[in-house]
């Protein structure tokens, strides 16, 4: 794999290779070329012409199959309305290329790398092909290191791996978007990194809401677009399956430039990885492949692996990926989520119960998991503190039924103490976010891992049993708890 992306765009060869459409079936086109002039698999083809109403047509498609008799089968990445047989098709001679570099920050792109935010064209100067090989073995960074987020519940209980892949599970309204925006903000401030957001097959309204919220929270700076911390790439659910299948690759290509050339740590968000699989399933059926288990494409494992293996740490930098995972009918054995799980290093589950209590971020400390939470990776102190927190919360959960009916008085002295500490831990796991300042009025807090461990050790040891529960709610480090308790007592 070449470290530096190509500095050339999708340039059209001097000798034009032109074919013509022989068949159109929805988003799938069959195109015939002259003998010996067949385009390669994944080459980008452009259909230009006029429809019957005299309107200009410009449709880009990607070669998927070579059929024989000088014919290829291609999948369109935009609507095929108005296309007719015998229209001319131009072979660009290369896969699609998209803009990369700092010029992409603060902008919204489609799958072809075209800006769709009405702020004019992107003057990137650099482009890179969306189909690239994963880094070779010798380029990989094999050292296991924690990616510190500054979010207490994540760093302590479900630490993220630098260059790892994290699954984000949660229904509507439990705080996925705010958590994503806080991570984007923190990687920029604490790590000097940038983020790329790939909206794969989700609702257009959600993409617009995210963009507006990012502008409001200054993750995207309207006044000075160059100071923005994120590039957005959208292929929404109203677009053809060819676009939805490739938008993840477009976002990843932009992220790879920041990793390989700028040598930065990058956060790549994919929302939703299930829609990537779904689009691949549609394309597979349209291409006439025999379906596999539950109707999915037979190439499911290969397609997922090709995308996921490009997301990794190299000796230059890292791409840490957070992927929202939709689980169809809550069936974790469905081939789409099951294939995704094989690639994940951690799972972050957002709980509606915690959100209802007003505890944000609403990360479920018992359901969320991480392969990094091992004593030989995070150290004995971190591991033992995390296990102590989990055991206390688990015991509190077991006692809920007794508390609900006979009440706290029926518990033993030891259990009452456990409940009191668990309630303090639960509140201390909440945290004010920088991106939520405009809504809450509370200044955001970045808490280092060292301070996080110290705070929870003090709660578990009983050093703070005398402080009121409310003092632990929506604060940063443990010193703020004592200060808040003093303020509340003086107010009383």
Curated annotation (Swiss-Prot):
BP-aspect Gene Ontology terms: proton motive force-driven mitochondrial ATP synthesis
Pfam family, one: ATP-synt_ab_N
Keywords, alphabetical: ATP synthesis, ATP-binding, CF(1), Hydrogen ion transport, Ion transport, Membrane, Nucleotide-binding, Plastid, Translocase, Transport
Localisation per UniProt entry: Plastid membrane
Highest taxon of source: Eukaryota
Keyword Lipid metabolism: no
Keyword hit for Glycoprotein: no
Enzyme class: translocase
InterPro entries: AAA+_ATPase, ATP-synt_VA_C, ATP_synth_F1_bsu, ATPase_a/bsu_AS, ATPase_alpha/beta_chains, ATPase_F1/V1/A1_a/bsu_N, ATPase_F1/V1/A1_a/bsu_N_sf, ATPase_F1/V1/A1_a/bsu_nucl-bd
Annotated binding of ATP, by residue: 170-177
Reaction it catalyzes: ATP + H2O + 4 H(+)(in) = ADP + phosphate + 5 H(+)(out)
Entry EC no(s): 7.1.2.2
SMART domains attached to this UniProt entry: AAA
Chief subcellular location: plastid
Its job: Produces ATP from ADP in the presence of a proton gradient across the membrane. The catalytic sites are hosted primarily by the beta subunits.
Subunit structure: F-type ATPases have 2 components, CF(1) - the catalytic core - and CF(0) - the membrane proton channel. CF(1) has five subunits: alpha(3), beta(3), gamma(1), delta(1), epsilon(1). CF(0) has four main subunits: a(1), b(1), b'(1) and c(9-12).
The family this protein is said to belong to: Belongs to the ATPase alpha/beta chains family.
Name of the protein described by the UniProt record: ATP synthase subunit beta, plastid
Organism of this sequence: Aneura mirabilis (Parasitic liverwort)
Gene name for this UniProt entry: atpB
């Amino acid at each position: 794999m070449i470290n530096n992306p190509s500095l050339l765009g999708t340039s059209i060869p001097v000798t034009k290779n032109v074919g013509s459409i022989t068949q159109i079936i929805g988003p799938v086109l069959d195109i015939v070329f002259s003998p010996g002039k067949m385009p390669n698999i994944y080459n980008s083809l452009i259909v230009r012409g006029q429809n019957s109403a005299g309107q200009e047509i410009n449709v880009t498609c990607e070669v998927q199959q070579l059929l024989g008799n000088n014919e290829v089968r291609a999948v369109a990445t935009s609507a095929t309305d108005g296309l007719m047989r015998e229209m001319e098709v131009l072979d660009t001679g290369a896969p699609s290329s998209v803009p990369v570099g700092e010029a992409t920050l603060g902008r919204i792109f489609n799958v072809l790398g075209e800006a769709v935010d009405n702020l004019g064209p992107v003057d990137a100067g650099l482009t890179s092909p969306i189909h690239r090989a994963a880094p070779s073995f010798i380029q990989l960074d094999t050292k296991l290191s924690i990616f510190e987020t500054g979010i207490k519940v994540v760093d302590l209980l479900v630490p993220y791996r630098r260059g790892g892949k994290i699954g984000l599970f949660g229904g509507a309204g439990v705080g996925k978007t705010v958590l994503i925006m806080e991570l984007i903000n923190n990687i920029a401030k604490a790590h000097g990194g940038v983020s790329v957001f790939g909206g794969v097959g989700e609702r257009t309204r959600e993409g617009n809401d995210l963009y507006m919220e990012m502008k409001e929270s200054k993750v995207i700076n309207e006044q000075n677009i160059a100071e923005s911390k994120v590039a957005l790439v959208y292929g929404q659910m109203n677009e053809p399956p060819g676009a939805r299948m490739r938008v993840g690759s477009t976002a990843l290509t932009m992220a790879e430039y920041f990793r390989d050339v700028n040598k930065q740590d990058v956060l790549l968000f994919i929302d939703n990885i299930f829609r990537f699989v779904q689009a691949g399933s549609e394309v597979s059926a349209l291409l006439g492949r025999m379906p596999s288990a539950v109707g999915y494409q037979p190439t499911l494992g290969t397609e997922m692996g090709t995308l996921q293996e490009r997301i990794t740490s190299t000796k230059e930098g890292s791409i840490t990926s957070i992927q929202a995972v939709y689980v169809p009918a809550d069936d974790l054995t469905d081939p789409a989520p099951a294939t995704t799980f094989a690639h994940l290093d951690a799972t972050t589950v957002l709980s509606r119960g915690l959100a209802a209590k007003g505890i944000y971020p609403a990360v479920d400390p018992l359901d969320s998991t991480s392969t990094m939470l091992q004593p030989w990776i995070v150290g004995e102190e971190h591991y033992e503190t995390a296990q102590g927190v989990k055991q206390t919360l688990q015991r509190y959960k077991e006692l809920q039924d007794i508390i609900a009916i006979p009440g706290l008085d029926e518990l033993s002295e030891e259990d009452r103490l456990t409940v009191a500490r668990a309630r303090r831990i639960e509140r201390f796991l909440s945290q004010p976010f920088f991106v939520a300042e405009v809504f809450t009025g509370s200044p955001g807090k970045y808490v280092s891992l060292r301070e996080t461990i110290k705070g929870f050790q003090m709660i578990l040891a009983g050093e703070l049993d005398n402080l009121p529960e409310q003092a632990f709610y929506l604060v940063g480090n443990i010193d703020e708890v004592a200060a808040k308790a003093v303020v509340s007592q003086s107010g009383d």
